[in-house]
Amino acid sequence: MDQNLKKMDWNVTTNGKSFILYFNYLVAHYEELPFVLRMRYAFRIIQYIYYPVLAVVGFAVNILSIVILPRGKCGVSRCVTRYLVAMAATDLLVIILDLILRHIPIHYQKELHFVRSFRVCNIHAILLQAATDCSVWFTVSFTFDRFMAICCQKLKTKYCTERTAAVVLGTVTLLSGFKNIFWYFILTGFYTLANMPWFCYITDDVLNSPVWAAIIFLHYILTPCIPFALILLLNTVTARRIILASRARRQLRGASSGDCPSDPEMASRRNSIILLFVISGNFILLWAVFMVNSIWTQMYFLGYDSVYIPFYVMDIGLMLQVLSCCTNTAIYAMTQTKCRQQFKNVGKYPFTLILKLIKR
């Protein structure tokens, strides 16, 4: 495809339509619009509400997680707590850098047009991509920690410690920051406020360079393709180990069918596998569309444009990807009784305080 078309697609701003204009246009021209445009306009309308609501909910949930988890009342080890707090902290950063400082200004350009005056878009991109990488690889690190705890009993006491968790998390953070420095040279400092994967203007040299396209392609291979493969592999091995161990334990206890309800070890294993699969499965499901679309986009710029993916697929991918940053902790709270109770207590506290003040 002609490179000029690529420039036009990736370096122009959106027309800054408001929610009302999008809605009225879709209603007035619904019958005459092709399906692809119907879907794209529909998702743009949804995003006007979706992103602000998600920002508020995600910000609150992750702040609560950072406050509650370190108190040690959720029934998990200090090592696991380290990982969960780190995941909540990086998810909070993604919410700030991606939702609040990127997606919301894109959809509310009239109210937030002053964002264009800040020429720090490439620095913003470095911070956002580094935070995103940390969020993804912290999930991988947590999955590997649970794999070691369940499948490698001899190494469990050495690896599954608070100190090791701190070293792993620190190393991942440093590598993620170093890995994403190249965005400073690919992107410019000017914001486009366009609803595209890149929210900064891109120079012609980058658009026409297969070298830069290959570097960006490699970036998406490292995150999230490799994490996908690692999480699937580790979960498969871990699940097999838990199932075999549980079966052997049932036989030793003389239970031919079903779990013994009075067996605390079986309950602990069941909780472990639920937590592991829900958090990592949530990551896989919510990142799948974004990963496929990102890989296709880079193949398109490398010249492989035989397969067409509609633009609304990109919208779906972005919406699900940012949703993943708000769900890990919420899912954890739903699957762990003690943690769920802590969140309930915090949620009830303001109302309890108000009632006490009223009674006075």
Feature annotation, model-predicted:
Residues P227-I231, I274, N282-L286, M291-V292, ...:
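Seventh transmembrane helix
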Residues L26-L37, Y108-A131, F178-I226:
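Loop architecture of class A 7-transmembrane GPCRs
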Residues Y83-L84, A89-T90, Y201, R240-F290:
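Intracellular effector-coupling site of seven-transmembrane GPCRs
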Residues I63-Y83, F144-V167, P261-L276, K338-V346, ...:
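Helix-loop boundary elements of multi-pass alpha-helical membrane proteins
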Residues Y51, A55, L93-E111, T132, ...:
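Helix-to-loop junction signature of class
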Residues R40-P52, C79-F142, A149:
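Extracellular TM2-ECL1-early TM3 structural module of rhodopsin-like
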Residues M1-V61:
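Extracellular N-terminal segment of 7TM GPCRs
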Residues L93, L97, I104-H107, A131-S141, ...:
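Fourth transmembrane helix
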